[in-house]
Amino acid sequence: MREPALAASAMAYHPFHAPRPADFPMSAFLAAAQPSFFPALALPPGALGKPLPDPGLAGAAAAAAAAAAAAEAGLHVSALGPHPPAAHLRSLKSLEPEDEVEDDPKVTLEAKELWDQFHKLGTEMVITKSGRRMFPPFKVRVSGLDKKAKYILLMDIVAADDCRYKFHNSRWMVAGKADPEMPKRMYIHPDSPATGEQWMAKPVAFHKLKLTNNISDKHGFTILNSMHKYQPRFHIVRANDILKLPYSTFRTYVFPETDFIAVTAYQNDKITQLKIDNNPFAKGFRDTGNGRREKRKQLTLPTLRLYEEHCKPERDGAESDASSCDPPPAREPPPSPSAAPSPLRLHRARAEEKPGAADSDPEPERTGEERSAAPLGRSPSRDASPARLTEPERSRERRSPERCSKEPTEGGGDGPFSLRSLEKERPEARRKDEGRKDVGEGKEPSLAPLVVQTDSASPLGAGHLPGLAFSSHLHGQQFFGPLGAGQPLFLHPGQFAMGPGAFSAMGMGHLLASVAGGSGSSGGAGPGTAAGLDAGGLGPAASAASTAAPFPFHLSQHMLASQGIPMPTFGGLFPYPYTYMAAAAAAASALPATSAAAAAAAAAGSLSRSPFLGSARPRLRFSPYQIPVTIPPSTSLLTTGLAAEGSKGGNSREPSPLPELALRKVGGPSRGALSPSGSAKEAASELQSIQRLVSGLESQRALSPGRESPK
């Protein structure tokens, strides 16, 4: 039988009787496991092996024998309170020689009224595997200590009885015998040892003590069994070194109102409400705030579900018995609904988060000079003053797809392939372009452009890549951003999840099919060119003064293959199938710059005469086989991102759409010595013929509106 503690006195001072003789062995302080020793007795080394009888189980004779054994060991026996002299053994002096210190410690419990409220309802303390602090925290105020002597203050938690409890019908009741006890651990106050003056200056708080149910805990937390009742104890030891604890005098203080039942979740709703009302850190149970209960109610929203994933509860916050979580990190705005999910990584540059780059609202009031949007990674100060740039500087600026969709050939107005001069000659092309929804005047992309990551700095010149736009099937969404030095370039995977009809008319600039060679102008494409072909056809050359090395060929083979994008040998983005207008651009991809436009025009003309391709419903029969073309390093290519269709294989179902003119130019020598005036006239006439072809095709499409392109 456990001897009951005395009734609470005015100072709530009780020498606590330990339930077993070997409650705290000396190894509790010398080993990491922290076992136990007998708190009311200071034993010499020779007496550690002697068994101490339990006074609660022994009779008067056993108690007298224990007193005699202690006397043989050289200890003084003193009686405290009305208990029998053998019931509470106390050493007046430690074995270590110390000066006589006159002290009479008195201990009072802080927040006693709050403890009384919990005690009336049955205090519960939550225990977790990671450790949970107590609330109310165990705080005491000590007085009567010697100001100069040093003291060690510590506490432990022992089983109040040998019963297991359950909460039934709104009350706690005994449910059986207690489970085996967990290892005993003492919690030494972190400020120990300290002088009596320091201890008496302020309340002594053990708020950092944590309770756990993890038997293999390595952090020194107090290990408890769930649904068992426990009693905290407070000890004062006069010693100047923690190593002297086993040989020092312990004064133990017990406050009956601090007993509690360890639980893994609160059982009594009244206890829960009392903790909410008094614990400022109990946000996990409030209906208002950032607690778990509130978030559980609102988790139907996907944004809050994402917030829950990134905001893991910090269950052991300062003086907290409930979970608390860090504030949510700054999150990017949600992506556009048109962006399809994909296993490919989508990286948006920081510049796209700025209003000037990410805002997709139309801005018709902006002039052409202001439409030179900031390339990725440029400072706002440079973007804010486009008027300061001279004409050559503007031609070397890396332009965004928004700029290119409006003026794809800025900086090339004086060249032979000037778009503006051709549109003046062809007013019907301007009217047609204005009526188109996907590349209308002032139309800006509804999705911020994405970029592709290269292994090294991009070798493109300032005007090498004007941009890339898709057909009306994609509703004018921009596909690529300008390739800047060191800027990532990733392909939007949502565009690849479409049927072949989505790519019925697609214009790509000098993108992935460039052949490394000498200096020369690089080709471009844009939806506003005269060779508009439903998605922008072949664009004129960019600034001829650009002498930077062309785009590396290994990008198309290695980088895109690593991302799961199919890539043909010669270059290009979509091997096959593609629709009827692709062959005109593909034919030009294998020709020198001086004859590319003529070949494209002739190929397009043959396509219009083809019985299969001239119909309103285009066929998807193209041979994927390609014939390599030998190109001298001195020539540059006016390329598109499509696979080269220079000639058809022997097993192709269709005749070759490339006329003799194009074949003669391919087989002939490089015509690098043509006069600029002759090449300009030839290119202008060929582009005009392509324009007439497009007008005829669109008229055929208008005559059969019910026919749709194959999906």
Swiss-Prot record:
Annotated keywords: Developmental protein, DNA-binding, Nucleus, Phosphoprotein, Transcription, Transcription regulation
Subcellular location: Nucleus
GO biological process terms held by the UniProt record: aorta morphogenesis; apoptotic process; atrioventricular canal development; atrioventricular canal morphogenesis; cardiac jelly development; cardiac muscle cell myoblast differentiation; cardiac muscle tissue development; cellular response to dexamethasone stimulus
Tissue: In adults, highest levels in lung. Also found in heart, kidney, and ovary.
Keyword DNA-binding: yes
Region (Disordered): 313-449, 640-687
Residues recorded as bearing Phosphoserine in the entry: 336, 342, 360, 623, 652, 656, 675
Compositionally biased residues, Pro residues: 326-340
Extent of Basic and acidic residues compositional bias: 363-372, 390-409, 421-444
Gene null: resulting phenotype: Knockouts do not survive beyond embryonic 14.5 dpc. Abnormal atrioventricular morphology at 9.5-10.5 dpc and outflow tract (OFT) septation defects in those surviving to 12.5 dpc. Hindlimb digit duplication at 14.5 dpc. Increased expression of CDKN1A, FRZB, IL33, SHISA3, and CCN4/WISP1 in lung mesenchyme between 12.5-14.5 dpc. Conditional knockdown targeted mainly to lung mesenchyme causes lung hypoplasia at 18.5 dpc. Conditional knockdown targeted mainly to the otic epithelium disrupts inner ear morphogenesis, which is exacerbated by simultaneous conditional knockdown of TBX3.
DNA-binding region: 109-287
Chain residue ranges for the region called Repression domain 1 (RD1): 518-602
Subunit: Binds DNA as a monomer. Interacts with CHD4, HDAC1 and HDAC2, perhaps as components of a NuRD-like complex. Interacts with CBX3, HMGB2 and PBX1. Interacts with PML.
Known role: Transcription factor which acts as a transcriptional repressor. May also function as a transcriptional activator. Binds to the palindromic T site 5'-TTCACACCTAGGTGTGAA-3' DNA sequence, or a half-site, which are present in the regulatory region of several genes. Required for cardiac atrioventricular canal formation. May cooperate with NKX2.5 to negatively modulate expression of NPPA/ANF in the atrioventricular canal. May play a role as a positive regulator of TGFB2 expression, perhaps acting in concert with GATA4 in the developing outflow tract myocardium.
Protein name in the entry: T-box transcription factor TBX2
Organism: Mus musculus (Mouse)
Organism lineage string: Eukaryota, Metazoa, Chordata, Craniata, Vertebrata
